[in-house]
From Swiss-Prot:
This is Phosphatidylglycerol--prolipoprotein diacylglyceryl transferase. PROSITE patterns: LGT. The chain crosses the membrane at residues 11-31, 49-69, 84-104, 109-129, 169-189, 196-216, 228-248. It comes from Clostridium botulinum (strain Langeland / NCTC 10281 / Type F). It is an enzyme of class 2 (transferase). It is a multi-pass membrane protein. Pathway: Protein modification; lipoprotein biosynthesis (diacylglyceryl transfer). Catalyzes the transfer of the diacylglyceryl group from phosphatidylglycerol to the sulfhydryl group of the N-terminal cysteine of a prolipoprotein, the first step in the formation of mature lipoproteins.
Amino acid sequence: MNPIAFHVGNLAIRWYGVVISIGAALGLLLAMYNCKIREASYDEFINMFLIAFPSAIIGARLYYVIFEFEDYRDNLINIFNIRQGGLAIHGGIIFGVLAVYIYLKYRKESFFEYVDVAAPSIILGQAIGRWGNFFNSEAHGGPVTKEFISKFPQFIQNGMFIEGTYYHPTFLYESIWNFIVCIFLVYLLKKTKKKGIVFMAYIGLYSLGRFFIEGLRTDSLYLGSIRVAQLISVLGIILSIFFIYNIIKKEKRY
């Protein structure tokens, strides 16, 4: 799999960056539609995005480097090289949401109003962004048989044939799951006006899928013997259930 999409002069533009950019652009288009559903300001959403997106990239890289610091200890400058991957989505979510919270608090805007609108766009960006892992030949699962991989399209088979071995296309599993969650969140955004429900559903559903898919991967970040992504996913599921229960309970009370 060739990770280079094209060249601009001597600069190689990698598919990883192209795919992330496409995901961000389509996420913004979806947000335009969702802002109309919730009668939220799209201009405010754009301002929020301009703060959240770079914050998420920084957070995703920092999160990854913290758990893989031994790979960078002797060459710290490589910490800033994200063109070949090395972005952890959980770090991106944490930093991005924190940046948005601070910004909206400063603007005296409703946090949940805007993150509800953002949730389908975030998961859409993640669904598309996973294909960047495909082009980088990373974030795959363990070895599989030729018979198993033959059930997938030929280009997937070719991409998952790495150094003489076929691997689980876990990037594809997560991408499909994220697309399904995105569709459900758009539906939920139309059906409920309760603030916070859509965003917390995103946290819970993404975490649910990630927990199971992470168990197949061979490149997990570890805390001792625990896969960090699975630990964060469990916390995300619990947090989601707790918040949604309390949001619904509070609404019934009034």
